[in-house]
Amino acid sequence: MKRLFSIWIFTLVGVVQIFAQPFAFDFSYVGYQQSEKEIPGADVVVFVKWKEGDQSARIQKAIDFVSARKMDKKTGLRGAVLLDKGVFELSQPLRIQTSGVVLRGTDRNQTVLYKKGVDRGAVVYLESEKQMQMLGEPMKLSAPWKLGERKVTLPAGCKMGDEILIVRPSTKEWIQKMGCADFGAGKDLGYWGWHPGEIDVRWTRSVVSDGKGGLQLDAPLSMSLGQDDAECFVQRIAGNDWRLKNVGVENLTIDSEYDATNPKDENHAWEGVYINKVKDGWVRMVNFRHLAGSAVVTQRDASRITVEDCISQAPVSEIGGYRRRTFLCMGEQCLFQRCYSEQGMHDFVAGLCAAGPNAFVQCDGYESLGYSGAVGPWCTGLLFDNVNIDGNDIKFCNLGLEGYGIGWNTANSLAYQCTAAGIFADSIPDGSNNHVFACWAQFNGSGDFQQCNNHAKPWSRFASLLEKRLGRDVSAQCRVLERERNNVSNNPTYDVAQKMVEEARKPRITMLMWIADSARFMASVSPVRAMDVDKIKERSKKKADLAHAGKPVFAIKEGKIMVANTLLKGARMNTPWWNGRVRYSAFPKIADAVTRFVPGMEGQGTTTRVDSVVAHLRDKHVVLFNQNYGLWYDRRRDDHERVRRRDGDVWAPFYEQPFARSGQGTAWDGLSKYDLTKLNPWYISRIKELAEKGAKNGLLVINQHYFQHNILEAGAHWVDCPWRPVNNINGTVFPEPVPFAGDKRVWMAEYFYNIDNPVMRQLHKQYIMKMLDAFADEPNVIQSIGEEYTGPYHFTKFWLQTVAEWEAKTGKHVWVALSCNKDVQDAILQEPELRKVVDIIHIEQWYYTQKGLYAPEGGKNLAPRQYQRRLRPGKVTYDDVFKSVSEYRQAYPEKAVIYSGASAPENGKAVMDAGGSCPNVK
């Protein structure tokens, strides 16, 4: 009887495996041309033969040549650039900015793009230079749209062929329903929570025929759209050429140089391929090695992208937040299939409100260091189909405060036939759900779990859905690695056991093996009849480019800062040094910064491109950019707690420090400790780039060596500071544990400015000289002792003496600004040897007011705002500013005087009339 019962159960399970249905959403509308067409094989147009040395310009010339060709109207292609076998060194990234252009290697393993240098961007960019433009006004939905439906009630203004933007706003009411207004501590810490407008989901879709005389969407949406807690709307997009089409990277290896002495080095390439404003593109059969961030990242405006048969190995980075998000999807309708990742922090993830469907199919992570799933809030419509995460989890759930308040990371998502250490799936307060079907793991959550620890038919949900939709066999394009399911019982016969022994002798086919053995590159890799890149004539430079070929001459003449013999006039801008949110709605509000870093994202409010910063400063008539390092690196510290972090899961935006990480030990923030004897090469390179590119506009960069904010006031200012002993490998001399005053305030200035201690003196001296070395050849960089500096005379003197020693040793001269309290400033200027070092007197910590002279003493262990609270300086007028500047112009006529004290922006004329420099006037 027991035997019959067992047979009955086995049969029942088999039936359930065949007929049970997972989440009924069609995830197949993803990938190049929605997986309806094969990726095309573009004809080879230009061949780039291998050569030694930097090949950035040669390959870019080939790309530009193909980009200038006419597009084939039938195929949408212009042609391919074919790279020879060999290691092509690159000092600059490659950029495809025109539709129909493909970058191809002759051999996947033997054609290598090897990126050198400290730039943390991508090796290859597929990105349009155009912007999405809207037509007309937003149109509200007149009826609800159901999840997964294509046949919906469109607003009357929509017509066949329109490309439309569909937006589901994140309202206060909806956020409260989701329980994400805060993640603990109530309103006091509500800034970590979701804010209205920050979690908006937006899709781009085309309006197509339904075949019955009506209209429908070309692909389903990954959420239902109602009117109960958000007024969803549709808006027409102007034209359909704002995104690139038919662009790709294929059949090659992307590798990055890194510092072999530092196993956690991050001053090298972070992304392999960066895709933005592209519709119908691909990355196929590409190997990635030694990257810190993502092999491939698709941005919000990337749609219908296929990434297939790609392998990422040997990443090099810290083990922490925003690192090793190997295959990262922030776009829509993206397909990642047959991809392999080793030692990723997040091997396969969607991020930041990615609008589905998006699919990861047949993807394996090996020795995974963190979960896969979604690393941003509210990434809807995510399919994990045959995704295997070795030693870590798949998470479709509420992550709460993690990652700067991710909260619900996904909804309407399905894990199908996956394996992981754990699978987390939750149902959502708004009525949506997450689904797990036929997976193997430890299970956790309130979501929809079916057929746990069982296999399912069909083996691939994606392949099944695609085959059903297209009505044809898709096995060739899906290439499913289907495991044999022989349903062997625990009581096999002798013959069956012997058969299984034979099977066990065969090596298990891994995804890595499957990609290598089954992927066949069919496009042409023949250079015959292709143009030789070295025979392409160089394009003549535009007159505008030639006009800026030489650097303008910066000089101080008769005590005034001049550029091209003209007084430099304009505004001052201070770099932001803390705060920020990785949210689309926040980016436009965040000020420009060149040493802010958001891995995987470039643009306003993130990793701002230096060209954009230069343009913005020019448009705002800024001539003084005041640069200092961040108060702290990691946004977790914005909570002003003083505690040691449990791990290195740091939150962006990151405000970089001037020192390099050592790769050794663990600092208070969970990353490796700093080495105060080495500068952060990325930090330096970004400031240098700003200075060099801004020079043509007459931009001056004030390079602040120190930032006093770290060593006074709130204890949180100090705990992550590189100078704190627990955060460096150099043995700095400060008390540990930190003697917080009142268990929350910090006074470390006395220790910091103690140059009688030989360890501290030598570290300061090395640092100052390295800073001077770094910018020695930039005539528009002004060296200044520090932001918010109210330090003592003896340290100011030491700093100037170190500058003088460096100038004597190198034979070079740099512009030096003296910015400190008035008593210290006057004492310095009265000493002839010190006065000779000073080029610019910078009035910032003192000034005249209607109450009289506001001039707190230096070296009293108080920050500028602490002085102001106590002394309460009065209103500052034209006459006050004029007096402040003119006194020093008359006393030291050979010195330039800059005024950045109170009311500086509105009193530029007073500065100019008094003979000052950089007055804020046009």
Q: What is each stretch, according to the model?
A:
Residues 93-97, 109-128, 153, 237-242, ...:
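Glycine-rich beta-solenoid repeat tracts in large extracellular/virion proteins
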Residues 3, 12, 18-262, 436-539:
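Extracellular "leader-to-stem" segments immediately downstream of a signal peptide or signal-anchor
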